């Protein structure tokens, strides 16, 4: 077998449609477009959603909801995923290095899950929940926040 002898499987491809090549082909004369009308003409196109002058559906339905501009995108990380890393000190640069967060520009929050903290770790400039703070401090670690957020996030 060679690359130039490989062919697609039987019935997997259709021959392309050749139009305007005589009435015997079934696609001669009008080329499958029918007689007259906008869609039979060259460039006969109407925009998507146009209903012939009737008020289009997307304009008949009422608007709903709104977009919150300036919404904070908080990146949440489980405490158990931090414990898998062989480090004792964590900040945004360490989390980014281990691909736990996508960007260092958005705030990070550590959330608790079922697993308890087995070793003393130090969380620096990372927002935490009350549960995480209790778990970390109970294990002998500490949570340092040098930047206080106005909303307490």
Swiss-Prot record:
Keywords: Ribonucleoprotein, Ribosomal protein, RNA-binding, rRNA-binding. Disulfide bonds: none annotated. The keyword Ribosomal protein applies. GO terms for biological process: translation. SUPFAM superfamilies: Ribosomal proteins L15p and L18e. GO terms for cellular component: cytosolic large ribosomal subunit. Residues 21-31 have a biased composition (Gly residues). HAMAP family: Ribosomal_uL15. Part of the 50S ribosomal subunit. This is Large ribosomal subunit protein uL15. The lineage of its organism: Bacteria, Pseudomonadati, Pseudomonadota, Betaproteobacteria, Nitrosomonadales.
């Amino acid at each position: 077998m060679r690359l130039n002898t490989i062919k697609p499987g039987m019935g997997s491809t259709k021959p392309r449609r050749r139009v305007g090549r005589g009435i015997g082909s079934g696609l001669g004369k009008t080329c499958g477009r029918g007689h007259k009308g906008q869609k039979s003409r060259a460039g006969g196109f109407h925009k998507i959603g146009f209903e012939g002058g009737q008020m289009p559906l997307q304009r008949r339905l009422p608007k709903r909801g709104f977009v919150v501009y300036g919404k904070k995108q908080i990146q949440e990380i489980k405490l158990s995923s931090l414990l898998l890393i062989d480090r004792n000190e964590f900040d945004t640069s360490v989390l980014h290095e281990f691909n736990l967060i996508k960007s260092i520009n958005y705030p990070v929050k550590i959330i608790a899950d079922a697993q308890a903290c087995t070793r003393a770790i130090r969380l620096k400039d990372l927002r935490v929940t009350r549960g995480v703070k209790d778990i970390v401090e109970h294990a002998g670690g500490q949570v340092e926040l040098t930047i206080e957020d106005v909303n307490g996030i």
